[in-house]
Amino acid sequence: MSRPPIDLRSDTVTRPTPAMRRAMAEAEVGDDVYGEDPTINRFQDRAAQLLGKEAALYVPSGTMANQLALRVLARPGSEVLCAARAHVFRYEAAAAAWNSAVQLHPFPDDDGLLDADALDETARDAGHHSPDVSLIAIENTHMPTCGRPWHTEEVAAVGAVADAHGIELYCDGARIWNAAVALGVPALELVAPATAVMFCVSKGLGAPVGSVLCGPRDMIREARVHRQRLGGGMRQAGVIAAAGLVALDSMIDRLADDHRRARRLAEAVAERWPGAVAPDTVETNMVCAIAERLPRDLLDRLDAEGIRAGTIDTRTVRFATHKDVDDADIERVLKTFEGITRE
């Protein structure tokens, strides 16, 4: 009998837990377009409370949550300052231009951060030849640097720039719970300077579908209107929101196990192929390895052994740990590494 595959391509491949499936089967539902789904309402209230915001809105995806935030917080014809490799800039099909008529201004993000001084200078330089800056968007954790978390003081520095210029700060917090667990601080502290924040429940938290946008009550009310325009009303979606409630109650603290396993994996990669990865840079659940330091056929060799890994780009191989990868799985991966030689 063949062994089940070990899927390290992304933390989006997780499957609902038995507790989630029971909650989904028993969920009380209503029509959420009318605001009448009690499970969704509880889920939204719980999310807002955990992140210190007034209200929240459940939406089908993180991309939709990001785009709703930009549509409400950024003025048409203005500029949004963001990281050069931010999800909102690189992976959302120019939706900000299409939906919100805003221009994204990317900044270098080699270490996963935005330089507060550079943001401040750009915000000051806006003149009649340049668009006004209406929003700064950050991503915590920063996926392209393999889950590098923003520390509280780093977020605060960017928040101070936003405050000084009277502009909004938005946090794409798809993996904000990974950041909070890695840093040992409440998530609400990490997002306190931000007007609004989004998080996903379908990544490390293991729920099947959706993201939650949290922010001021008036903003969320307007975002609900734009959600409808984008076709994001999901009617009796309490059946999936129920899994999100279970995730918030029981899946956050266990992210520490994912982080520990990612570090173990990084140490093994570094030992097997020196220079491919620096283990001390692995703070959350992702390991990024330099492709040219690895065997050219590594992904194929792993796949032949039932182990799936992915890439961020042509230069970077990524391994993402999650709840469906346990210690025995990691040991199986490490043993497989031992049998693969570097060309």
Enumerate the language-model features and the residues they cover.
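Conserved PLP-enzyme active-site core in the AAT-like
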Residues: 2-305, 309-325, 329-341
